[in-house]
Amino acid sequence: MWRRAEESRRHELVGIVRDVAEARFPYPSVAAPHYRTHVNLPTPEMGLTVAGGGVRALYPDILVVQYPGNHPAMVVQVESKETVTREQAERVWAPLQTADAPLYVYVPAGHLASARDYARAAGIKGVRFRTWRRQPGGVIVQEF
């Protein structure tokens, strides 16, 4: 089976993450001046500190924080068709769950059922799924 190069996939994902951040998390804004959006692709900007097996920082694709204080408000992970997998749910989505902020996982249109199954198998509860579809000039997001 043909699989695109990792560099190509990563380049596309960086653009999709940027488009999702601009469209769905345009903070700070007049309506929400106390929020700040940090995009961690291609370079980590703001981490989420988690405990468990030692304190460590995780870098979701998008992290929205309340300012001042940088308290997590929304944790967002954006996936490509290659990364909607059981391993991704276990190794990436599950650790991003926090009691402090909801976890949003954006998956390509057509991959929602698989993503839900993987999240359930990984014991992830309360995840909020969205689908994305590339369109000329940006990304269209659908909420579920």
Per-segment meaning from a language model:
Residues 57, 70-73, 79-129:
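Catalytic cores of nucleic-acid endonucleases
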Residues 1-18, 22-74, 136-137, 143:
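Active-site metal-binding core of divalent-cation-utilizing nuclease and nuclease-like domains
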Residues 37, 43, 49, 83-85, ...:
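Residue-identity detector for threonine
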Residues 123-140, 144:
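Charged, structured surface patches that assemble and position nucleic-acid processing machinery
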